[in-house]
Amino acid sequence: MKFLLGTLVVLATFVTLCNSQCYFIPNQSLKPNECQDLKGVSHPLNSVWKTKDCEECTCGQNAISCCNTAAIPTGYDTNKCQKILNKKTCTYTVVEKKDPGKTCDVTGWVL
């Protein structure tokens, strides 16, 4: 019972910290069983795919929904540091602007 309670507390904390960045594209495809993304690529209805920009998209009846899958760093010195997205691993690193070989402290991440 304690294990179950502990698991629920961790899950609730994780859900509270999540703040996905999503957007919707109205489905303007002339075909009823597919969606067309902004690049003109057709996707079957109810399909899910990942983009090269670290987004996961879903083709729905009325729209395509896309959400960011890379955790975005927050709580770092934006004057001194910059975030860099590695599109191969869908992860950010935060480095000094003047010396990109040095990493910066990050106090939070938002998904």
Curated annotation (Swiss-Prot):
GO cellular component: a single term: extracellular region
Compartment(s) of residence: Secreted
Keyword annotations: Disulfide bond, Pyrrolidone carboxylic acid, Secreted, Signal
Q: Tissue expression, per UniProt? A: Corpora lutea, mostly in the luteal cells surrounding blood vessels.
Disulfide connectivity?
A: 22-67, 35-59, 54-90, 57-66, 81-104
Q: What is its main location?
A: secreted
Under the heading InterPro entries, the entry gives: PSP94
Q: Which parts of the sequence carry Pyrrolidone carboxylic acid?
A: 21
What residue range is the signal peptide? Answer: 1-20
The record describes its quaternary structure and partners as: Homodimer; Interacts with PI16.
Which family does the UniProt entry place this protein in? Belongs to the beta-microseminoprotein family.
Can you name this protein?
Answer: Beta-microseminoprotein
